[in-house]
Amino acid sequence: MSDRQQVTNARGERIAIVSGLRTPFAKQATAFHGVSALDMGKMVVNELLSRSELDPKLVEQLVYGQVVQMPAAPNIAREIVLGTGMNVATDAYSVTRACATSFQSTVNIAESIMTGNIEIGIAGGADSSSVLPIGVSKKLAHALVDLTKARTFGQKLAIFRRLGIKDLLPVPPAVAEYSTGLSMGQTAEQMAKTHGISRADQDAMAHRSHTLAAQTWASGVMKNEVMVAHVPPYNQFIEKDNNIRESSDLASYAKLRPVFDRKHGSVTAANSTPLTDGASALLLMSEGRAKALGYTPIGYIKSYAFAAIDVWEDMLMGPSYATPMALKRAGMQLEDLTLIEMHEAFAAQALANMKMFASKKFAEEKLGQNRAIGEIDMSKFNVLGGSLAYGHPFAATGARLITQMCNELKRRGGGVGLTTACAAGGLGAAMILEVE
């Protein structure tokens, strides 16, 4: 049995990425304050369809993701279909794979095309850190259910008397892993300590990311993949990511105090991604259908892989496990790649993964391979800047990486690129893209 992955349909046609688009990414409680993930999702899918000049009725399936879900609209994908002029019979369902969510939605659409179930589909993801499902305490939730069963005033009063003042306080969404109680930042701090990632190296990576992202925006190339978002009540708009430090100064990074280990830590707000609002979407088709409709795809999916590892240590090392799987399925080595895009959740996490890529010991002990994945050539790595600068709306980041990679390879005359991300729960994703 071959290790190669056949990312084609029964006719041998490749899975074409026709176009990709995203909203600007905005820091929490700024430009998209009060705008839900659903509204941003509808916004970007509408604009994607408009720019593609595709009849919405031709879309056969939409798979969309959201990490911080709103109880009022648990199936964000179906709501997007109903809010964007697509046929009401269009199949739609929602997925979540933490920070790799839009990798998952993309793969789901690709696999639907591979099996012949559809020819045209849309994938993507959206998240809002500004519109959050604020909950109630367990005791209050229990009491509210009991109140629905109480028949007399006395019974209701007895239920209220069980509650204290603190039981009435709102409960924000958890920022820690359910299974471990550890936050992503605490895991990044652990990885920095375990793998000897210095504060100086983390700050240097953040500075590099912001500098390259600022240069990329200044060059004008991002305008083709980032829409202008008009924010309700439509008296203002946002046209650019607002987390990027336009004049990043490396010396200024050293002034910030560590966040997750204030005494001995190295992970700061500046070398971590901020809480971010945003949405992204991809239009995918079978190669034959894309050409029949007159489209020139921006890229094709060559291979993909997902990995799952232990959550107690090095939980954000997913790229180091998923990447060798995707490379093997593509029949490639790391040095064969033209470009590499790795999600920078934290500088510490990205640097730790890069270190493991180059480690023969890691390959032997963790991957069962006799050679390292490979040392990353920094001239190929996150050449337009990364998540540290652009921000990270959890479910939207994967599609950003895919779109950005395809467009940059196209500008360079084609090639093959790796996109990869870590994710909460010890998950990892990798996708190899080819561009002509």
UniProtKB/Swiss-Prot annotation:
Domain of life: Bacteria
Keyword annotations from UniProtKB, A to Z: Acyltransferase, Cytoplasm, Fatty acid metabolism, Lipid degradation, Lipid metabolism, Transferase
Protein's name according to its UniProt entry: 3-ketoacyl-CoA thiolase
Family, per entry: Belongs to the thiolase-like superfamily. Thiolase family.
Active site: 99 (acyl-thioester intermediate), 392 (proton acceptor), 422 (proton acceptor)
Main location: cytoplasm
HAMAP family per the UniProt record, alphabetical: FadI (MF_01618)
Organism: Shewanella amazonensis (strain ATCC BAA-1098 / SB2B)
Gene assigned in the entry: fadI
A Pfam family reported for this protein in Swiss-Prot or TrEMBL: Thiolase_C
